[in-house]
Amino acid sequence: MNMAERAEATKSWSCEPLSGKTLEEIVQNAENAADLVAYIRKPEVDLDFRLKFIAEHEEFFNVQLSDRNSRIRTCHNLSDKGIRGDTVFVFVPGLAGNLEQFEPLLELVDSDQKAFLTLDLPGFGHSSEWSDYPMLKVVELIFVLVCDVLRKWSTAVPNNDNVNPFNGHKIVLVGHSMGCFLACHLYEQHMADTKAVQTLVLLTPPKAHIEQLSKDKHIIQWALYGVFKLPWLFDVYRNKFDQVKGLQSSGIKQYFYQQGDDVKLKYRKFWQFKNNISNKSRTIIGYLLGWETVDWVKFNGVLTQTDMKQKIIIFGAEKDPIAPIENLEFYKQTINKECLRKVIILPDCSHNLCFDRPELVCENFQREVIDNSKL
């Protein structure tokens, strides 16, 4: 992508809803709804927030683990013509997130003729639910899924379980929020040995050690388990006290810093709100119960192996109340200095950085990640 094309790609974020309505129509209808939650839940509204780009690149995979089978929604631009180039960008969403949150970056990577793959985590979006959500089991699923997708669509790799699906490929692993932990576990436990991971990109990573989710915090663990078994308790709070506030609910106010009447911004907020009310309380609590902190000493040790040349790039959001930029000090002090290439702080931006300031995120991602993946 030349300079003129890059400027055009990062200047304006666009989208095409499958409903065929304009963004102005969709936003106006939502703003005029007497009961926003009831309106957003209507089946006929679904296509207002289903984008053509996502639909054209959507594929479901049945992923088999030793103790569970899952139907996982993916979005990728791989095809029977093979994988574009040798680099595949793998995007891992965070807690209560789904693949749609990466849409601006997916379009950017696609426009640069690069391959991408992302997924709805189990229990979120359109992926099947689990009876429980151990974080390392989710990580295993992501690894198996990536292998399955590469085997299916790579013309250079036979569709054979005995063949290394990463042969000839470089992986850029991108995680958002909790997805940063999933990406780090994925790298340390499964992908370091493949020698395929070129870069890890951590978008608004959470606090490195969340004491409240420690397994020795027995009272908190029992409380979470109680809500997991009786999710309607959390539903009462979400439905009666939070989501009724619409775009003033916590899931919007904490995810967005930008304000104003820009129709694209309003559309993204309503899109986020629709995803928020679709998430089940049981799934959210299940992920908190299954939380596993990264062993940062072990992770750093894997990074510093002499035959590894990984790069780590961190994006923080200046106005993020969920993952404050102060949390990044741990990563800057802990991660090997030769691997930590850059820490980028996005001004006037909150937690859902791809929806809050998509143009700024794309501009920095193009310069710091995509362009450097060519080196």
Swiss-Prot record:
The active site is at S177 (charge relay system). Its main location: other. Gene3D superfamilies: alpha/beta hydrolase. It comes from the Eukaryota. GO terms for cellular component: endoplasmic reticulum; lipid droplet; membrane. Residues 88-358 form the AB hydrolase-1 domain. Pfam families: Abhydrolase_1 (PF00561). GO terms for molecular function: hydrolase activity, acting on ester bonds; monoacylglycerol lipase activity; serine hydrolase activity; triacylglycerol lipase activity. GO terms for biological process: acylglycerol catabolic process; lipid homeostasis. Keywords: Hydrolase, Lipid degradation, Lipid droplet, Lipid metabolism. Its EC number is 3.1.1.3. A motif (Microbody targeting signal) lies at residues 373-375. Disulfide bonds: none annotated. It is found in: Lipid droplet. Disruption phenotype: Leads to the appearance of giant lipid droplets and an excessive accumulation of non-polar lipids and phospholipids upon growth on medium containing oleic acid as a sole carbon source. Belongs to the AB hydrolase superfamily. Lipase family. Serine hydrolase required for the maintenance of steady state level of non-polar and polar lipids of lipid droplets and thus plays a role in maintaining the lipids homeostasis. Exhibits both esterase and triacylglycerol lipase activity. This is Lipid droplet hydrolase 1. The lineage of its organism: Eukaryota, Fungi, Dikarya, Ascomycota, Saccharomycotina.
